[in-house]
Regions:
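Exposed beta-sheet edge and beta->alpha loop/turn motif
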Residues: 104-163
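Short, low-complexity N-terminal intrinsically disordered segments enriched in polar/charged residues
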Residues: 24-60
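Solvent-exposed, acidic/flexible segments
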Residues: 31-38, 50, 69-73, 89, ...
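N-terminal secretory signal peptides that target proteins for export/translocation
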Residues: 1-10
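Bacterial N-terminal signal peptides
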Residues: 12-24
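Short solvent-exposed beta->alpha transition segments
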Residues: 58-116
């Protein structure tokens, strides 16, 4: 039971950090369009997560990070290291449901993330690959011109959520 809980937390951490990677450089080239900033970094963030670039991903978490599980930035970094060591390969498949900006320096992302040990080409492969499916609600903050994850919550998802 403890191992299962730790594995679920690891999935959550990796996926959260993936989302952070998506938005981390958003301030550089498209300063006037935050939504375009978030969307333009999807491929870059996926690459960082799949290539296990832990240092890059860790830099994308706010020092003020906290979540409903009582985790802070240090706890997330520790879990991330464990997850990256435990999994030989990581492949992600994402669907953004919504990006909202309640304030100029705050963003809320609602997205679906599937994780598997093999590449996921489309929604039809999710069941065959037995991918772990999650829905994430992530709050981002722009700190000194860079987007960082401030809070993230997740729950299990169904294949239909990806359609």
């Amino acid at each position: 039971m403890a191992e299962r809980k730790r594995a679920l937390t690891c999935h959550w951490v990796l996926t959260t950090l993936f989302v952070v990677a998506l938005v981390s450089g958003a301030c550089s080239s498209d300063r006037d369009n935050p939504e375009k900033q978030v969307r333009s970094l999807l491929a870059q963030g996926e690459t960082a997560a799949e290539q296990k670039q832990a240092g890059t991903l860790r830099q994308m978490i706010s020092e003020k990070y906290s979540d409903s599980q009582g985790q802070d930035k240090k706890a997330i970094e520790s879990t991330l290291r464990y997850y990256l060591l435990r999994h030989q390969t990581i492949h992600l498949f994402t669907r953004i449901r919504e990006i909202a900006f309640p304030a100029p320096d705050l963003a809320h992302v609602d997205m679906m993330v599937a994780m598997a040990g093999q590449p996921i080409a489309n929604v039809g492969e999710l069941e065959r690959l037995q991918a772990d499916l999650h829905r994430f609600e992530i709050n981002l903050v722009r700190e000194q011109g860079e987007w960082k994850v401030l809070r993230a919550e997740w729950r299990r998802a169904e294949i239909g959520d990806f359609l």
